[in-house]
Amino acid sequence: TPDILHAFLQHGGRAAFELRAVLAATLSPTWGIYSGYELCENTPLREGSEEYLDSEKYQLRPRDWDTADTIAPLITKLNTIRRRHPALQRLRNLRFHHADNDAVLVFSKRAGQDTVLVVVNLDPHHTQEATVSLDMPQLGRDRDESLSVHDELTGETYAWGTHNYVRLEPGRAPAHVFHVQAAPASPQIGGSPAS
């Protein structure tokens, strides 16, 4: 249920809320958040409890939305990405890809010509690095094809192939949400921005 405050959120800080928002917004065609999630509210009723200290089950809780430290800009961006990509509006098109680090999750969703590739750091405390190996046919591409991937969160564009290096730092880049595009005329394979 959305009103459960799991230990991951209690101790993971803002980065835990960010990575969970990315996962929820991209794995499923529908998503929602509990009031206060965008403010990263994570105070439990008592140590070891999964219940919020100021649960709305028992009271109305006023919040100062204008001065709060919030992940609302990330949530707004995720909603914009979801509207822009039909692949994220489908349920049965989820495909997982390999990363050589268990703290990095990689998956794609494809609908017609629209393909979205998501790479998420599951560790809210530490920077994680991995080599991501793409199942190119699952992306609708030839095995040796080069790709241009545009990160919808940062605006950066990379040239990717079958094997790619990623580095995701909590608080800076919780994930990549890539729009997979046709490769540039002279691709440079690797993790450096192409533009």
State where each predicted segment sits:
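Carbohydrate-interacting/catalytic domains
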Residues: A7-G12, F17-R20, L27-S28, I33, ...
